[in-house]
Amino acid sequence: MLLLLLGWPGAVGAAGQSRHFTTSDGVRLHYIEAGTGPRTLVFVPGWSMPAWIFERQVASLSREFRVVALDPRSQGQSEIARAGHDHVRRAGDIAELVARLGPRPVVVVGWSLGVLDTLAYVRLHGDGQVAALVLIDNSVGEEPPPPPPAQPMKPGPKLPREVMMKNFVRGMFATRQPDAWLERLTQAALRTPEEVARQLLAYPVPRTWWREAVYSTSRPVLYMVRPKWTGQAENLRDKHPSAEVALLSNAVGHALFVDDPAGFEARLRDFLRRRVWP
């Protein structure tokens, strides 16, 4: 009954404990934490998304690891910040969270825009506190560039933001998700102000900056992507001595850890067991 009320697709309801910290520029950030022990996973979500989109992973993986999921500034339950919606400040937010979590290196798991935030963290703050990187379904600046949209925007009246966000959220999944859960996710995404959302899609660096970032680390890297990123994945695998790739099918959508949580977690556990914490 609880699962039905929450509208959650096959996982527990409120996984983990809510925690907060204040950044060096005075912004109160929220994160979810579950599990204990010396092995810590830090999940960083995508554009406008809340930390609880990883709720299934927090519940499952916290049986073995300490698991943290961040609400980036102006997302989820974090404070709507007046500034800092760029790669430099958001990288600093991750660095300050990692420092707060303790002295042992962590595995940072970035999804979508969280891939770029994670790469910015490594490039600007180094990988001294990083045990490994897991980069999910976004460009890492390798060749070839991202393909153009399959369906270019048609001229005409702009859709209301609420409609656009609803379509965006539903488009992240290849499998059917409960309507109540999708509506909850849409409302969470709409909490990010429109101007902030625009800024987050316009980080002022060339795409080669991200390539240099991923090659700046010698830590193990798992690049888990759908077919649209096959070219970048193959180049990264061939050129980066510490990288490996997991090429998924189009049976999963952009939020592949929601569409196939068991498969995602199995791949992640295998990587951690072989490359990070044998």
What does each of the following model-derived ranges do?
Residues 24-25, 32, 69-109, 113, ...:
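Active-site loop/oxyanion-hole signature of alpha/beta-hydrolase fold enzymes
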